[in-house]
Amino acid sequence: MIRFLLLDIDDTLLDFAEQEKDALGKTFTHLGLPLTLEMLQRHRQITVELWQRHDRGACTRDDVIYGRFRMLFDEFNLQADPVTVEHTYQAFLCRGAFPIAGAKEALARLARQYAIYGVTNGLVETAVPRLEKAGMMPFFRAVFVSDTIGAHKPEAEFFHRCFAQIPDFDPACAMIIGDNLQTDIRGGLHVGLKTCWFNYRHQPADPTVRPDHTVTKWSQVESILL
């Protein structure tokens, strides 16, 4: 019987693409820098590529958060300090939230029956404020962020460090819900969790990763669990 829910945040509870677009627009305006649609799309590509390298252990967190702007500015011949831009971007990022349709309402209902924990890669200073802004934090017992855990999904060490902080935790009684087949689903399967792939963006399946459930919206999650 499922008693614990481990929830990813970005593109599971919050629409990160919208949040990123909003924060980047405000950052570049604040710093007097031009921002085109092409630059916005390229920033997303670079960020995804760097986080994938990070997930494989090929680069550090700082390589990702500062390197993405350094690479972007080099490609578009912009003169700006990547560190200043990153800090400004993070400040704007944590000031807003774009909840995925039905997520908050589903959390409120699920929290009556399950112990809910957040499990996310990223920075605690942006993850938690965005959940607070969205009005979702009251439904969580705790939120575990790779930045403070000292490991990141899909590493088994990340999950085991989270498990150690959850009272009476049993992996056999837990389900992870997330949008990423590799970090959430493959990672969860490797440590004995039930898995639910939240395929919000309708990504192609990977035949080597077999989630227990696949959904595209929160009403389907509720149908499984309630």
PLM regions: where:
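Intrinsically disordered, low-complexity segments enriched in small/polar residues
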Residues: 14, 41, 87, 112-115, ...
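Catalytic-core regions built around general acid/base machinery
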Residues: 102-113
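Asp-based, Mg2+/Mn2+-dependent phosphohydrolase catalytic module
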Residues: 1-5, 18, 34, 108, ...
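N-terminal helical cap/lid subdomain that shapes the substrate entry/recognition surface
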Residues: 2-101
